[in-house]
Amino acid sequence: MSLMDPLANALNHVSNCESVGKNVAYLKPASKLIGRVLNVMQDQGYIGNFEYIEDGKAGVYKVDLIGQINKCGAVKPRYAVKNHDFEKFEKRYLPAKGFGLLIVSTPKGLMTHDEARNAGVGGRLISYIY
């Protein structure tokens, strides 16, 4: 059986592991997009270290959880957003203004919605976390 959305599955697994109090989550299958999303989450202080483990198939990410995530998930469909329209999606996906972040895929790479707004670029919404 194939996964329809590996990113949504990975973020849901992280959220579930965080809610039951686990210290480590193993995300399988691994992909470049999942790795980049984990990198943004680590830069913003939501997760600890993570590492890629080769298992002879698609690979596994081992993620150290630090108890900072209340909820995270993928945005479906992946809306195209202009740099001045982020506030509408903040109201939809985040509980309060200035709390949490949206992860956006831009021509300059994956970044948070605040970084994209400051850089003056738009993109597609990938996920949310708070």
Curated annotation (Swiss-Prot):
InterPro entries linked to this entry: Ribosomal_uS8, Ribosomal_uS8_CS, Ribosomal_uS8_sf
The keyword Transit peptide is annotated on this UniProt entry: no
Entry keyword annotation includes rRNA-binding: yes
GO cellular component: ribonucleoprotein complex; ribosome
SUPFAM superfamilies linked to this entry: Ribosomal protein S8 (SSF56047)
GO MF entry, a single one: structural constituent of ribosome
UniProt keywords, alphabetically: Ribonucleoprotein, Ribosomal protein, RNA-binding, rRNA-binding
GO biological process, one term: translation
Function summary: One of the primary rRNA binding proteins, it binds directly to 16S rRNA central domain where it helps coordinate assembly of the platform of the 30S subunit.
Subunit structure and binding partners: Part of the 30S ribosomal subunit.
Similarity field: Belongs to the universal ribosomal protein uS8 family.
This protein's name: Small ribosomal subunit protein uS8
Source organism (scientific name): Methanococcus maripaludis (strain DSM 14266 / JCM 13030 / NBRC 101832 / S2 / LL)
Gene responsible for this protein: rps8
